[in-house]
Amino acid sequence: MRRYFGTDGVRGEAGKPPLTPEFVLKLGQAAGAYFLAQEKRPVVLLAKDTRESSDLLEAALAAGLMSQGVRVEHLGVLPTPGVAHLTKALKATAGAVISASHNPYQDNGIKFFGPTGEKLPDGAEEEIERLLLEDHPTRGIGTVGDFREAERMYLDFLLAHAPDLTGLKVGLDLAHGATYRIGPKLFQKAGAEVMAFFNTPDGRNINRGCGSTHPEALSRFVVELGLDLGIAFDGDGDRVQFIDRKGRLFHGDHVLYLAALAFGEKGVVGTVMSNMALEVALKERGLAFHRAAVGDRYVLEKLKETGLALGGEPSGHVIFLRHHTTGDGLLTALLTLKALKALGGDLADWYEALPLYPQVLLNVRVSDKAKVMADPRLGEAVREAEARLGGRGRVNVRPSGTEPVVRVMVEAEEGAEEVARELAERVRALSQEAQAV
Protein backbone atom coordinates (compact mmCIF):
# COMPACT_ATOMS: atom_id res chain seq x y z
CA MET A 1 0.00 0.00 0.00
CA ARG A 2 1.53 3.32 -1.09
CA ARG A 3 1.33 6.20 1.36
CA TYR A 4 2.67 9.07 -0.74
CA PHE A 5 2.40 8.05 -4.39
CA GLY A 6 -1.04 8.38 -5.94
CA THR A 7 -2.18 7.67 -9.50
CA ASP A 8 0.14 10.37 -10.83
CA GLY A 9 3.10 10.61 -8.48
CA VAL A 10 3.28 12.52 -5.21
CA ARG A 11 0.84 15.44 -5.03
CA GLY A 12 -0.09 18.07 -2.49
CA GLU A 13 -0.01 21.72 -1.57
CA ALA A 14 3.53 23.05 -1.96
CA GLY A 15 5.21 23.88 1.35
CA LYS A 16 2.83 21.71 3.38
CA PRO A 17 3.24 18.01 4.22
CA PRO A 18 4.12 16.00 2.32
CA LEU A 19 5.46 18.55 -0.19
CA THR A 20 7.89 20.35 2.11
CA PRO A 21 11.49 20.91 0.96
CA GLU A 22 12.64 18.59 3.76
CA PHE A 23 10.43 15.75 2.55
CA VAL A 24 11.34 16.29 -1.11
CA LEU A 25 15.04 16.17 -0.19
CA LYS A 26 14.42 12.79 1.50
CA LEU A 27 12.39 11.64 -1.49
CA GLY A 28 15.33 12.53 -3.72
CA GLN A 29 17.67 10.53 -1.47
CA ALA A 30 15.35 7.51 -1.50
CA ALA A 31 14.84 7.70 -5.27
CA GLY A 32 18.59 8.17 -5.74
CA ALA A 33 19.28 5.06 -3.67
CA TYR A 34 16.73 3.15 -5.76
CA PHE A 35 18.26 4.29 -9.07
CA LEU A 36 21.76 3.54 -7.79
CA ALA A 37 20.68 -0.05 -7.22
CA GLN A 38 19.58 -0.22 -10.88
CA GLU A 39 22.66 1.35 -12.45
CA LYS A 40 26.25 2.10 -11.40
CA ARG A 41 26.25 5.72 -12.64
CA PRO A 42 22.63 6.82 -12.77
CA VAL A 43 21.52 9.86 -14.77
CA VAL A 44 18.16 11.52 -14.06
CA LEU A 45 16.55 14.10 -16.36
CA LEU A 46 14.69 16.74 -14.34
CA ALA A 47 12.05 19.16 -15.67
CA LYS A 48 9.34 21.37 -14.20
CA ASP A 49 6.26 23.40 -15.03
CA THR A 50 5.71 27.12 -14.40
CA ARG A 51 4.43 27.13 -10.79
CA GLU A 52 6.19 29.46 -8.37
CA SER A 53 7.03 26.50 -6.10
CA SER A 54 8.64 24.43 -8.86
CA ASP A 55 12.12 25.98 -8.46
CA LEU A 56 12.19 25.24 -4.72
CA LEU A 57 11.05 21.63 -5.08
CA GLU A 58 13.35 21.10 -8.06
CA ALA A 59 16.35 22.23 -5.97
CA ALA A 60 15.40 19.95 -3.06
CA LEU A 61 14.84 16.91 -5.27
CA ALA A 62 18.08 17.49 -7.19
CA ALA A 63 20.06 17.81 -3.94
CA GLY A 64 18.65 14.53 -2.66
CA LEU A 65 19.42 12.72 -5.90
CA MET A 66 22.96 14.11 -6.09
CA SER A 67 23.67 13.09 -2.48
CA GLN A 68 23.42 9.51 -3.73
CA GLY A 69 25.87 10.09 -6.58
CA VAL A 70 23.24 10.66 -9.28
CA ARG A 71 23.99 13.01 -12.17
CA VAL A 72 21.07 15.39 -12.67
CA GLU A 73 20.43 16.98 -16.05
CA HIS A 74 18.15 20.01 -15.79
CA LEU A 75 15.75 20.34 -18.74
CA GLY A 76 14.05 23.54 -17.54
CA VAL A 77 10.36 24.11 -18.26
CA LEU A 78 9.23 21.24 -20.49
CA PRO A 79 5.96 19.31 -20.92
CA THR A 80 5.82 16.07 -18.95
CA PRO A 81 5.59 13.85 -22.08
CA GLY A 82 8.75 15.54 -23.38
CA VAL A 83 10.58 14.20 -20.34
CA ALA A 84 9.20 10.71 -20.98
CA HIS A 85 10.37 10.87 -24.60
CA LEU A 86 13.86 12.17 -23.76
CA THR A 87 14.37 9.67 -20.93
CA LYS A 88 13.96 6.86 -23.44
CA ALA A 89 15.72 8.59 -26.35
CA LEU A 90 18.79 9.54 -24.29
CA LYS A 91 18.87 6.19 -22.44
CA ALA A 92 18.76 7.95 -19.06
CA THR A 93 18.20 5.97 -15.88
CA ALA A 94 15.05 7.93 -15.11
CA GLY A 95 13.15 11.14 -15.67
CA ALA A 96 11.48 13.31 -13.05
CA VAL A 97 8.97 16.13 -13.36
CA ILE A 98 7.95 18.79 -10.86
CA SER A 99 4.30 19.49 -11.71
CA ALA A 100 0.71 19.12 -10.52
CA SER A 101 -0.70 18.95 -14.05
CA HIS A 102 -4.16 20.58 -14.17
CA ASN A 103 -4.29 21.51 -10.46
CA PRO A 104 -4.14 25.14 -9.25
CA TYR A 105 -0.78 26.84 -8.66
CA GLN A 106 -0.77 26.20 -4.90
CA ASP A 107 -0.41 22.47 -5.57
CA ASN A 108 2.61 20.73 -6.95
CA GLY A 109 3.87 17.21 -7.40
CA ILE A 110 6.68 14.89 -8.39
CA LYS A 111 6.46 12.01 -10.82
CA PHE A 112 9.12 9.67 -12.13
CA PHE A 113 9.63 7.87 -15.44
CA GLY A 114 11.71 4.75 -15.93
CA PRO A 115 14.27 4.16 -18.71
CA THR A 116 11.55 2.98 -21.13
CA GLY A 117 9.79 6.35 -20.87
CA GLU A 118 6.90 4.87 -18.89
CA LYS A 119 5.84 5.98 -15.43
CA LEU A 120 7.47 3.93 -12.70
CA PRO A 121 5.41 0.83 -11.89
CA ASP A 122 3.62 0.53 -8.57
CA GLY A 123 6.30 -1.83 -7.26
CA ALA A 124 9.08 0.69 -7.88
CA GLU A 125 7.13 3.45 -6.13
CA GLU A 126 6.50 1.13 -3.18
CA GLU A 127 10.24 0.40 -2.96
CA ILE A 128 11.05 4.14 -2.98
CA GLU A 129 8.52 4.61 -0.18
CA ARG A 130 10.22 1.82 1.79
CA LEU A 131 13.58 3.52 1.27
CA LEU A 132 12.07 6.76 2.59
CA LEU A 133 11.95 5.13 6.02
CA GLU A 134 15.73 4.61 6.04
CA ASP A 135 18.59 7.05 6.54
CA HIS A 136 20.69 7.60 3.44
CA PRO A 137 24.16 8.94 4.16
CA THR A 138 25.91 10.65 1.26
CA ARG A 139 27.13 7.93 -1.12
CA GLY A 140 28.86 10.19 -3.59
CA ILE A 141 28.94 13.67 -4.99
CA GLY A 142 26.55 13.81 -7.89
CA THR A 143 27.02 16.34 -10.64
CA VAL A 144 24.56 18.61 -12.40
CA GLY A 145 24.16 19.85 -15.95
CA ASP A 146 21.82 22.00 -18.04
CA PHE A 147 20.72 20.05 -21.09
CA ARG A 148 19.98 22.92 -23.48
CA GLU A 149 18.91 20.69 -26.38
CA ALA A 150 15.86 19.31 -24.58
CA GLU A 151 13.20 21.52 -26.17
CA ARG A 152 14.72 21.23 -29.66
CA MET A 153 14.89 17.42 -29.46
CA TYR A 154 11.30 17.16 -28.26
CA LEU A 155 10.18 19.60 -30.95
CA ASP A 156 11.91 17.52 -33.64
CA PHE A 157 10.16 14.38 -32.35
CA LEU A 158 6.77 16.10 -32.58
CA LEU A 159 7.38 17.61 -36.01
CA ALA A 160 8.10 14.12 -37.36
CA HIS A 161 4.40 13.36 -36.72
CA ALA A 162 2.97 16.68 -37.90
CA PRO A 163 0.72 16.95 -40.97
CA ASP A 164 0.93 20.02 -43.20
CA LEU A 165 -1.25 22.60 -41.45
CA THR A 166 -0.85 25.37 -44.02
CA GLY A 167 -3.92 27.61 -44.10
CA LEU A 168 -5.35 26.32 -40.83
CA LYS A 169 -6.28 29.02 -38.28
CA VAL A 170 -5.68 27.57 -34.83
CA GLY A 171 -6.21 29.05 -31.37
CA LEU A 172 -3.94 27.61 -28.69
CA ASP A 173 -4.75 27.81 -24.98
CA LEU A 174 -1.39 27.16 -23.29
CA ALA A 175 -2.77 27.34 -19.71
CA HIS A 176 0.20 29.57 -18.72
CA GLY A 177 1.94 26.21 -18.35
CA ALA A 178 4.70 24.01 -19.71
CA THR A 179 3.56 24.26 -23.36
CA TYR A 180 3.66 28.08 -23.44
CA ARG A 181 6.85 28.23 -25.56
CA ILE A 182 6.94 24.98 -27.48
CA GLY A 183 3.23 24.92 -28.43
CA PRO A 184 3.20 28.00 -30.69
CA LYS A 185 6.60 27.06 -32.19
CA LEU A 186 5.32 23.59 -33.10
CA PHE A 187 2.15 24.68 -34.86
CA GLN A 188 3.86 27.55 -36.66
CA LYS A 189 6.55 25.21 -37.97
CA ALA A 190 3.79 22.86 -39.18
CA GLY A 191 2.36 25.73 -41.23
CA ALA A 192 -0.63 26.81 -39.14
CA GLU A 193 -1.71 30.38 -38.53
CA VAL A 194 -1.48 30.49 -34.75
CA MET A 195 -3.20 32.67 -32.19
CA ALA A 196 -1.77 31.96 -28.73
CA PHE A 197 -3.77 32.59 -25.56
CA PHE A 198 -2.85 32.23 -21.87
CA ASN A 199 0.87 32.08 -22.66
CA THR A 200 2.34 34.48 -20.08
CA PRO A 201 3.07 32.46 -16.93
CA ASP A 202 3.75 34.39 -13.73
CA GLY A 203 4.05 31.44 -11.34
CA ARG A 204 0.49 31.76 -10.06
CA ASN A 205 -1.75 31.85 -13.12
CA ILE A 206 -1.20 28.29 -14.36
CA ASN A 207 -4.59 26.67 -15.21
CA ARG A 208 -6.47 29.67 -13.76
CA GLY A 209 -9.63 30.09 -15.84
CA CYS A 210 -7.90 28.46 -18.78
CA GLY A 211 -6.42 25.23 -20.10
CA SER A 212 -8.03 21.88 -20.79
CA THR A 213 -10.14 21.96 -17.62
CA HIS A 214 -11.48 25.47 -18.37
CA PRO A 215 -11.90 25.71 -22.16
CA GLU A 216 -14.80 28.20 -22.04
CA ALA A 217 -12.67 31.26 -22.90
CA LEU A 218 -11.03 29.46 -25.82
CA SER A 219 -14.46 28.43 -27.07
CA ARG A 220 -15.50 32.08 -27.10
CA PHE A 221 -12.31 33.16 -28.90
CA VAL A 222 -12.72 30.50 -31.61
CA VAL A 223 -16.23 31.69 -32.47
CA GLU A 224 -15.54 35.43 -32.16
CA LEU A 225 -12.33 35.32 -34.23
CA GLY A 226 -13.58 32.85 -36.83
CA LEU A 227 -10.87 30.26 -36.13
CA ASP A 228 -10.98 26.77 -37.61
CA LEU A 229 -10.49 25.16 -34.20
CA GLY A 230 -9.07 25.64 -30.74
CA ILE A 231 -6.67 23.40 -28.81
CA ALA A 232 -6.39 23.63 -25.01
CA PHE A 233 -3.57 22.01 -23.03
CA ASP A 234 -3.24 21.52 -19.30
CA GLY A 235 -0.46 22.84 -17.08
CA ASP A 236 2.06 20.10 -17.84
CA GLY A 237 0.98 19.32 -21.40
CA ASP A 238 -0.02 15.68 -21.04
CA ARG A 239 -3.69 16.23 -21.86
CA VAL A 240 -5.57 18.19 -24.50
CA GLN A 241 -9.11 19.25 -25.36
CA PHE A 242 -10.36 20.62 -28.67
CA ILE A 243 -12.93 23.25 -29.61
CA ASP A 244 -14.65 22.97 -32.99
CA ARG A 245 -15.42 26.00 -35.17
CA LYS A 246 -18.86 26.25 -33.57
CA GLY A 247 -17.35 26.56 -30.09
CA ARG A 248 -18.24 23.04 -28.93
CA LEU A 249 -16.02 20.83 -26.80
CA PHE A 250 -14.55 17.96 -28.83
CA HIS A 251 -13.11 15.84 -26.05
CA GLY A 252 -11.19 12.63 -25.52
CA ASP A 253 -14.01 10.26 -26.51
CA HIS A 254 -14.42 12.08 -29.85
CA VAL A 255 -10.65 11.88 -30.41
CA LEU A 256 -10.59 8.13 -29.74
CA TYR A 257 -13.45 7.51 -32.18
CA LEU A 258 -11.89 9.64 -34.92
CA ALA A 259 -8.41 8.16 -34.47
CA ALA A 260 -9.65 4.56 -34.33
CA LEU A 261 -11.32 4.95 -37.72
CA ALA A 262 -8.50 6.94 -39.33
CA PHE A 263 -5.64 4.70 -38.25
CA GLY A 264 -7.31 1.32 -38.70
CA GLU A 265 -7.27 0.31 -35.05
CA LYS A 266 -8.73 -3.04 -33.99
CA GLY A 267 -10.10 -1.58 -30.80
CA VAL A 268 -9.81 1.11 -28.16
CA VAL A 269 -9.17 1.25 -24.43
CA GLY A 270 -11.24 3.82 -22.55
CA THR A 271 -11.97 4.15 -18.84
CA VAL A 272 -14.95 3.83 -16.54
CA MET A 273 -15.58 7.51 -17.33
CA SER A 274 -15.77 7.02 -21.12
CA ASN A 275 -19.16 7.83 -22.61
CA MET A 276 -21.39 4.86 -23.42
CA ALA A 277 -21.97 6.32 -26.90
CA LEU A 278 -18.30 5.70 -27.75
CA GLU A 279 -18.57 2.04 -26.79
CA VAL A 280 -21.77 1.58 -28.82
CA ALA A 281 -20.38 3.38 -31.91
CA LEU A 282 -17.14 1.39 -31.93
CA LYS A 283 -18.93 -1.95 -31.51
CA GLU A 284 -21.28 -1.07 -34.37
CA ARG A 285 -18.15 -0.84 -36.55
CA GLY A 286 -16.81 -4.15 -35.26
CA LEU A 287 -14.16 -2.59 -33.03
CA ALA A 288 -13.43 -3.79 -29.50
CA PHE A 289 -13.82 -1.51 -26.51
CA HIS A 290 -12.29 -2.09 -23.08
CA ARG A 291 -12.60 -0.02 -19.91
CA ALA A 292 -9.68 0.60 -17.56
CA ALA A 293 -9.57 2.35 -14.20
CA VAL A 294 -9.14 6.12 -14.37
CA GLY A 295 -5.54 7.23 -14.88
CA ASP A 296 -3.30 6.99 -17.92
CA ARG A 297 -1.05 4.42 -16.19
CA TYR A 298 -4.07 2.06 -16.03
CA VAL A 299 -4.99 2.80 -19.64
CA LEU A 300 -1.43 1.83 -20.59
CA GLU A 301 -1.66 -1.40 -18.57
CA LYS A 302 -4.91 -2.33 -20.34
CA LEU A 303 -3.39 -1.52 -23.75
CA LYS A 304 -0.55 -3.95 -23.05
CA GLU A 305 -2.95 -6.56 -21.70
CA THR A 306 -5.20 -6.40 -24.79
CA GLY A 307 -2.50 -5.81 -27.41
CA LEU A 308 -4.21 -2.61 -28.58
CA ALA A 309 -2.43 0.64 -29.45
CA LEU A 310 -4.97 3.42 -28.82
CA GLY A 311 -6.47 4.42 -25.51
CA GLY A 312 -7.43 7.40 -23.43
CA GLU A 313 -9.78 9.32 -21.20
CA PRO A 314 -12.51 11.90 -21.82
CA SER A 315 -10.31 14.42 -19.97
CA GLY A 316 -7.90 14.41 -22.89
CA HIS A 317 -5.20 11.95 -21.83
CA VAL A 318 -4.76 9.95 -25.04
CA ILE A 319 -2.05 7.35 -25.63
CA PHE A 320 -0.94 6.50 -29.16
CA LEU A 321 1.22 3.55 -28.18
CA ARG A 322 2.87 3.19 -31.58
CA HIS A 323 4.31 6.68 -31.16
CA HIS A 324 4.73 7.32 -27.44
CA THR A 325 4.69 5.65 -24.03
CA THR A 326 2.40 8.14 -22.32
CA GLY A 327 -0.34 10.70 -22.92
CA ASP A 328 1.04 13.68 -24.85
CA GLY A 329 -1.19 16.68 -25.52
CA LEU A 330 0.91 18.11 -28.35
CA LEU A 331 1.29 14.74 -30.08
CA THR A 332 -2.42 14.00 -29.67
CA ALA A 333 -3.26 17.35 -31.27
CA LEU A 334 -1.06 16.61 -34.29
CA LEU A 335 -2.36 13.07 -34.76
CA THR A 336 -5.98 14.23 -34.41
CA LEU A 337 -5.40 16.75 -37.20
CA LYS A 338 -3.70 14.02 -39.24
CA ALA A 339 -6.78 11.82 -38.72
CA LEU A 340 -9.02 14.63 -40.00
CA LYS A 341 -6.91 14.91 -43.13
CA ALA A 342 -7.17 11.16 -43.70
CA LEU A 343 -10.95 10.96 -43.27
CA GLY A 344 -12.03 14.39 -44.48
CA GLY A 345 -14.26 16.90 -42.74
CA ASP A 346 -13.45 19.03 -39.73
CA LEU A 347 -13.98 18.73 -35.98
CA ALA A 348 -17.55 20.02 -36.27
CA ASP A 349 -18.44 17.21 -38.69
CA TRP A 350 -16.94 14.54 -36.45
CA TYR A 351 -18.52 16.03 -33.34
CA GLU A 352 -21.89 15.35 -34.94
CA ALA A 353 -20.81 11.85 -36.00
CA LEU A 354 -20.63 10.80 -32.33
CA PRO A 355 -23.59 12.19 -30.34
CA LEU A 356 -22.61 11.58 -26.73
CA TYR A 357 -25.08 10.53 -24.06
CA PRO A 358 -25.70 13.32 -21.50
CA GLN A 359 -23.13 12.91 -18.73
CA VAL A 360 -22.96 14.83 -15.46
CA LEU A 361 -19.73 14.85 -13.44
CA LEU A 362 -19.75 16.44 -9.97
CA ASN A 363 -16.69 16.80 -7.73
CA VAL A 364 -17.46 16.57 -4.02
CA ARG A 365 -14.72 17.81 -1.69
CA VAL A 366 -14.42 15.42 1.26
CA SER A 367 -12.44 15.21 4.48
CA ASP A 368 -11.44 11.54 4.12
CA LYS A 369 -11.81 9.78 0.75
CA ALA A 370 -11.07 6.33 2.16
CA LYS A 371 -13.76 6.56 4.87
CA VAL A 372 -16.40 7.81 2.47
CA MET A 373 -15.65 5.13 -0.12
CA ALA A 374 -15.66 2.37 2.53
CA ASP A 375 -19.04 3.38 3.96
CA PRO A 376 -21.59 0.67 2.99
CA ARG A 377 -24.27 3.37 2.71
CA LEU A 378 -22.46 4.74 -0.33
CA GLY A 379 -22.90 1.41 -2.12
CA GLU A 380 -26.60 1.47 -1.26
CA ALA A 381 -26.92 5.01 -2.62
CA VAL A 382 -25.23 4.00 -5.88
CA ARG A 383 -27.55 1.00 -6.29
CA GLU A 384 -30.57 3.24 -5.68
CA ALA A 385 -29.31 5.70 -8.31
CA GLU A 386 -28.81 2.89 -10.83
CA ALA A 387 -32.32 1.60 -10.14
CA ARG A 388 -33.75 5.05 -10.85
CA LEU A 389 -32.10 5.00 -14.28
CA GLY A 390 -33.81 1.70 -15.03
CA GLY A 391 -30.89 0.15 -16.89
CA ARG A 392 -30.70 3.08 -19.33
CA GLY A 393 -27.59 4.70 -17.92
CA ARG A 394 -24.45 4.34 -15.81
CA VAL A 395 -23.36 5.53 -12.38
CA ASN A 396 -19.75 5.74 -11.26
CA VAL A 397 -18.46 7.05 -7.94
CA ARG A 398 -14.71 7.08 -7.38
CA PRO A 399 -12.07 8.91 -5.35
CA SER A 400 -9.73 11.25 -7.19
CA GLY A 401 -6.16 10.01 -7.25
CA THR A 402 -4.76 13.54 -7.03
CA GLU A 403 -7.20 15.67 -4.99
CA PRO A 404 -9.32 15.38 -1.78
CA VAL A 405 -12.36 14.81 -3.94
CA VAL A 406 -14.91 12.08 -4.69
CA ARG A 407 -16.13 12.21 -8.29
CA VAL A 408 -19.78 11.38 -8.99
CA MET A 409 -20.58 10.56 -12.61
CA VAL A 410 -24.05 9.82 -13.94
CA GLU A 411 -24.69 9.12 -17.60
CA ALA A 412 -28.17 8.66 -19.05
CA GLU A 413 -30.35 9.77 -21.92
CA GLU A 414 -32.71 11.37 -19.36
CA GLY A 415 -32.53 12.39 -15.70
CA ALA A 416 -28.74 12.36 -15.28
CA GLU A 417 -28.49 15.78 -13.64
CA GLU A 418 -31.06 15.16 -10.91
CA VAL A 419 -29.68 11.72 -10.03
CA ALA A 420 -26.10 13.06 -9.94
CA ARG A 421 -27.04 16.00 -7.73
CA GLU A 422 -28.84 13.79 -5.20
CA LEU A 423 -26.01 11.26 -5.13
CA ALA A 424 -23.45 14.04 -4.62
CA GLU A 425 -25.47 15.27 -1.63
CA ARG A 426 -25.34 11.76 -0.13
CA VAL A 427 -21.55 11.73 -0.56
CA ARG A 428 -21.29 15.17 1.08
CA ALA A 429 -23.42 14.04 4.03
CA LEU A 430 -21.28 10.91 4.54
CA SER A 431 -18.14 13.06 4.52
CA GLN A 432 -19.56 15.41 7.15
CA GLU A 433 -20.49 12.45 9.35
CA ALA A 434 -17.01 10.96 8.98
CA GLN A 435 -15.44 14.29 9.94
CA ALA A 436 -17.62 14.58 13.04
CA VAL A 437 -16.56 11.17 14.39
UniProtKB/Swiss-Prot annotation:
It is an enzyme of class 5 (isomerase). It comes from the Bacteria. One of its GO terms (molecular function) is phosphomannomutase activity. The gene is glmM. InterPro entries: A-D-PHexomutase_a/b/a-I, A-D-PHexomutase_a/b/a-I/II/III, A-D-PHexomutase_a/b/a-II, A-D-PHexomutase_a/b/a-III, A-D-PHexomutase_C, A-D-PHexomutase_C_sf, Alpha-D-phosphohexomutase_SF, GlmM_bact. GO terms for cellular component: cytosol. Activated by phosphorylation. Binds 1 Mg(2+) ion per subunit. Catalyzes the conversion of glucosamine-6-phosphate to glucosamine-1-phosphate. One of its GO terms (biological process) is peptidoglycan biosynthetic process. NCBIfam families: glmM (TIGR01455), PRK10887.1 (NF008139). Belongs to the phosphohexose mutase family. This is Phosphoglucosamine mutase. Mg(2+) binds at S101, D234, D236, D238. The keyword Isomerase applies. Keywords: Isomerase, Magnesium, Metal-binding, Phosphoprotein. The lineage of its organism: Bacteria, Thermotogati, Deinococcota, Deinococci, Thermales. Its EC number is 5.4.2.10. It comes from Thermus thermophilus (strain ATCC 27634 / DSM 579 / HB8). The active site is at S101 (phosphoserine intermediate). Its cofactor is Mg(2+). The modification Phosphoserine is found at S101. It catalyses: alpha-D-glucosamine 1-phosphate = D-glucosamine 6-phosphate.
